[in-house]
């Protein structure tokens, strides 16, 4: 892609999200979401491959349907209340708005587009889709968190954690695994949004850090399938060992960073007399942990048979090397500073 066009698309992505963040009006928020959608579609179709074009088409149709539902619900709410303010939402329209935002996020049971779209695009674009594109819809949910239906949020969260874990079990494509991982993590964020929005923000920040780290690692290793991971131990032994810890952190194992948000969410759900919900979500996290362990096993304990012994490639010549160690440290070792993180919110 032409660098000037790429710059325009990236600036538009930032502009759309910023507009949604700063808006207190549903029309401006809707405009920001649409700018986001239109800006990422050329990045998706940049690959000039039928799968990339198919992914961009699926994404456009899904996001257009969600945007129409969001605009319809905000219009009905404005007709009933007489104003377009985001914070003033009546209960029926709040549920309809939640469903529209869930479609944009890829939350179960309206998640079917996300794995297919993720599989058809490059890892760099997949990183944007899995992290940056979640910010604007979640910002809207944060603003209407007091008017959300707790039963609907718990149902969406439970379904997402279960579907995210169950759907990733039989996958061999890393991009699809990361898509189901995204669905599962969004389930945790959605389930706590009504009860403690600040905790949802902490979970979102940790999710973005861990997911960014994993996409950067897979891009460095140039691996898109589980089988491709098996040859990386002989090429990048140090990176492979640290990647295993990052995967386990993504699964929420203590004492790694990913344990912090899950622990706090389970504690808050229990305080809200939702012990059964917390138990089901904790058990569904074991499903996700299985495919993280599967990736770790392929990466660190299997070596593809070959007759030629590769020289150990300890120096990774890549442009993102200076960013990757910082992201890895944050992914693995943020639990000791968790009291400081909690006090910030």
UniProtKB/Swiss-Prot annotation:
Regions that span the bilayer: 3-23, 25-45, 59-79, 95-115, 148-168, 177-196, 201-223, 236-256, 273-293, 322-342
- Classification via InterPro entries: Complex_I_Subunit_2, NADH_DH_su2_C, NADH_UbQ_OxRdtase_chain2, ND/Mrp_TM
EC identifiers of the protein: 7.1.1.2
GO-annotated molecular function: NADH dehydrogenase (ubiquinone) activity
Gene Ontology cellular-component annotations: mitochondrial inner membrane
Membrane topology classification: Multi-pass membrane protein
- Subcellular localization, as worded in the UniProt entry: Mitochondrion inner membrane
Q: Does the keyword Phosphoprotein apply?
A: no
Tell me, which GO biological process terms does this entry list? mitochondrial electron transport, NADH to ubiquinone
Protein keywords: Electron transport, Membrane, Mitochondrion, Mitochondrion inner membrane, NAD, Respiratory chain, Translocase, Transmembrane, Transmembrane helix, Transport, Ubiquinone
The catalysed reaction is: a ubiquinone + NADH + 5 H(+)(in) = a ubiquinol + NAD(+) + 4 H(+)(out)
Q: What is its main location?
A: mitochondrion
Q: Name one Pfam family in it.
A: NADH_dehy_S2_C
Which PANTHER family does the UniProt entry name for this protein? NADH-UBIQUINONE OXIDOREDUCTASE CHAIN 2
- Which protein family is named in the record? Belongs to the complex I subunit 2 family.
Function field: Core subunit of the mitochondrial membrane respiratory chain NADH dehydrogenase (Complex I) that is believed to belong to the minimal assembly required for catalysis. Complex I functions in the transfer of electrons from NADH to the respiratory chain. The immediate electron acceptor for the enzyme is believed to be ubiquinone.
Q: What is this protein called?
A: NADH-ubiquinone oxidoreductase chain 2
Q: Which gene encodes it?
A: MT-ND2
């Amino acid at each position: 892609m032409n660098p000037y066009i790429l710059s325009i698309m990236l600036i538009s992505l930032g502009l759309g999200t910023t507009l949604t963040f700063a808006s207190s009006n549903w029309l401006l928020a809707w405009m920001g979401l649409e700018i986001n959608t239109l800006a990422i579609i050329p990045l998706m179709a940049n690959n000039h491959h039928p799968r990339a074009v198919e992914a961009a088409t699926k994404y456009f149709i899904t996001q257009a349907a969600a945007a129409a539902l969001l605009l319809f619900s905000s219009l009905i709410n404005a007709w009933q209340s007489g104003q377009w303010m985001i914070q003033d939402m009546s209960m029926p329209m709040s549920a309809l708005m939640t469903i529209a935002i869930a479609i944009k996020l890829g939350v179960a049971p309206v998640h079917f587009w996300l794995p297919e779209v993720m599989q058809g695009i490059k890892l760099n674009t997949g990183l944007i889709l899995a992290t940056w594109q979640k910010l604007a819809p979640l910002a809207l949910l944060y603003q209407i968190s007091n008017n959300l239906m707790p039963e609907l949020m718990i149902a969406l969260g439970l379904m997402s954690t279960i579907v995210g874990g169950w759907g990733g079990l039989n996958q061999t494509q890393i991009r699809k695994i990361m898509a189901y991982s995204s669905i599962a993590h969004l389930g945790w964020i959605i389930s706590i949004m009504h009860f403690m929005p600040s905790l949802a923000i902490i979970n979102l920040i940790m999710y973005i850090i861990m997911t960014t780290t994993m996409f950067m690692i897979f891009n460095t290793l140039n691996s898109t399938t589980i089988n491709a991971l098996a040859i990386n131990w002989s090429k990048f032994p140090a990176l492979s060992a640290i990647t295993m810890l990052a995967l386990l952190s993504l699964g929420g194992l203590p004492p790694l960073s990913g344990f912090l948000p899950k622990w706090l969410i389970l504690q808050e759900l229990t305080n809200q007399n939702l012990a059964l919900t917390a138990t089901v979500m904790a058990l569904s996290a074991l499903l996700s942990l299985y495919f993280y362990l599967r990736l770790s096993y392929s990466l660190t304990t299997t070596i593809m048979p070959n007759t030629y012994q590769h020289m150990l490639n300890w120096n990774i010549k890549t442009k993102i090397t200076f960013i990757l160690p910082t992201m890895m440290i944050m992914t693995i070792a943020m639990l000791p500073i968790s009291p400081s993180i909690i006090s910030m919110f």
